[in-house]
A protein has these predicted regions:
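Short, non-transmembrane cytosolic segments of multipass membrane proteins
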Residues: 1-42
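Juxtamembrane cytosolic face of transmembrane helices
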Residues: 118-119, 149-173
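Cytosolic/matrix-facing juxtamembrane and C-terminal tails of multi-pass cellular membrane proteins
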Residues: 138-142, 148, 205, 209, ...
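A membrane-cytosol interface segment of integral membrane proteins
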Residues: 161-224
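N-terminal topogenic membrane-targeting module
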Residues: 118-140
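Phosphoinositide-dependent membrane-docking surfaces
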Residues: 131-132, 139-159
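Residue-level recognition of beta-strand termini and adjacent short loop/turns
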Residues: 37-54
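Alpha-helical transmembrane spans
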Residues: 53-120, 233-306
Length: 306
């Protein structure tokens, strides 16, 4: 569970590109010798645009679950035992509130990062006009030219003693060196080679067209116009340990608790809507041969390529 860029280790902006970022740059017109992988991140795909979920979507609800449980801890751990032991006492109540209120404020702030916000923060890649649209946390939209974005691998938090990585897109100033804004593509892992599969999926769509990756999309998130179903969210959370059945089984109680937080976060958040001018730029033909969305999903999420 890595919340880099959202909670901890915010993406630094208004700075120059580092040597490491330059050496890890992902070249847009270079075809990598690796198979593209959609990472179960697609919402829609067609001849005009590819829309994906945000980097943190796979973890959505985990922090909410921790906070919801955490909000009740002082009551059950301190207040109720105190009342049972000494009865109602104003001084004890003041001490309890003095300690608990700052803690509740912290839990509420963390909870607001996942709940009472947006169900997701979509990223849309338009291969026709070569533009990228990123839905920000405040409801505004970042619009940038695909050719002007500097994509690179970025260091995240360490996971179980190993360095975790993600793919970042830096929007640069006119000098070509100063970072004005950063967004991340869906997916993070300690295995850099896996990220290159995910990058190749996005890169081929934008550089080679929808036909190059159409058959690589097996399942789409049904969240464009409605909130995610509880069962879909629960199954999707298991994908964070895809290919590790023992880990999935052993952590199934954790996933279940987190799924309740995910359900709460989704039900208290709004569905993002693109501005009318962006929808006009991304118009899709009714008989698009490369149309993929949730209406064509199989019954279950394929966790491995078919």
């Amino acid at each position: 569970m890595d919340y880099t860029g959202l909670l901890a280790k915010k993406y630094r902006v208004n700075r120059k590109l580092t040597d490491e970022e330059r050496s890890n740059q992902l070249i847009k017109n270079k075809r990598y010798k690796t198979e593209p992988f959609y990472n179960i991140s697609v919402i829609k795909e067609n001849s005009t645009y590819l829309e994906c979920v945000d980097r943190w979507f796979i973890y959505r609800g985990s922090m909410a679950a921790v906070c919801l449980v955490g909000l009740t801890v002082p009551v059950y751990s301190f207040f109720i035992p105190l009342i049972l032991a000494v009865g109602f006492d104003r001084i004890a109540l003041c001490i309890f509130l003095g300690i608990s209120i700052p803690y509740w404020i912290l839990m509420g702030w963390l909870l607001s990062k996942e709940a009472f916000s947006w169900t997701h923060f979509p990223i849309r890649f338009n291969c026709k006009n070569r533009m990228v649209y990123v839905f920000r946390r405040n409801g505004t939209v970042l619009i940038a030219k695909w050719d002007d974005i500097f994509f690179t691998l970025g260091r995240c938090e360490r996971m179980v003693g190993r360095q975790n990585w993600d793919i970042r897109g830096h929007v640069l100033d006119k000098d070509g060196e100063t970072i004005l804004e950063t967004f991340a593509l869906p997916g993070d892992t300690v295995l850099v080679e896996q990220l290159k599969h995910c990058w190749e999926f996005i890169r081929r769509y934008m550089e080679e067209g929808p036909a190059s990756v159409y058959r690589d999309v097996y399942w789409c998130h049904d969240i464009a116009e409605r909130r995610e179903k509880y069962t879909a969210g629960l199954r999707y959370m298991f994908f964070s340990l895809n290919g590790q059945p023992i880990g999935q089984i052993s952590l199934s109680p954790v996933f279940f608790v987190a799924s309740l937080g995910r359900w709460f976060a989704m039900r208290t958040s709004k569905i993002p809507k693109w501005p009318a001018e962006i929808e006009a730029e991304c118009a899709v033909d009714a008989f698009d041969p490369y149309l993929r969305d949730a209406s064509r999903n199989p019954e279950k999420i394929p966790t491995e390529p078919m």
